[in-house]
Amino acid sequence: METVLNSCEIRVLGCLVEKELATPEYYPLTLNALTAACNQKSNRDPVMALEDADVVRALDSLRMKGFARQSAEGVRAMKYCHCLAEKFLLEPPDLAVLAELLVRGPQTVGELRTRAERMRPFADLAAVEEVLRMLMEREEPLVTRLPRQPGRKEQRYAHLLAGAPEAEGEESMAPPEGARLQVRAENERVARLEEEVTALRAEVAELRRMMEEFRSQFE
């Protein structure tokens, strides 16, 4: 894919899609609800321990890339939702399979059918295979079939939103160049924001000092 997401963005996006389908009554999600969803112990691989700041950074990046947006429904608290359906013209069955791949990584057809049940029931394995076929045969594929692992009968499928997955057993000495550049850009952006906050705090402190001096002239 042209746009590559990092692991935190993948988890945030997957949780937004999952919660829309599994618990629509609580969707869109507040920051607290989204962070809790990202750090769930169940239905997650790997289990993560993200802070609110991590989720906010991921949301900002996803919004800039057109994968998520702030919901107008968030009156008292800011709420967030995904844009996958509009961005890629996906139907609920597509979203259910993709969400499962986003939050749990590569899986077999059987695993996807069982685990996606909480979001969208599939009549049989053929129904899941059809969704996977459509996601793979798009002009811009969203899913790929992985090579069969030694000793395993079934092949697994993986999403492509984080780029092409590494071959099984392959150890990467360094992250892909695209991901490395994204992380560097994100770190630089955060550093700039921190510098701006520091400068603003200094200005506020100086204004307070000047105000105190001004008041003291009339006491």
Swiss-Prot record:
Gene3D superfamilies: Winged helix-like DNA-binding domain superfamily/Winged helix DNA-binding domain (1.10.10.10). InterPro entries: DUF480 (IPR007432), WH-like_DNA-bd_sf (IPR036388), WH_DNA-bd_sf (IPR036390). Transmembrane segments: none annotated. Pfam families: DUF480. Belongs to the UPF0502 family. PANTHER family: UPF0502 PROTEIN YCEH. This is UPF0502 protein Gmet_0262. It comes from Geobacter metallireducens (strain ATCC 53774 / DSM 7210 / GS-15).
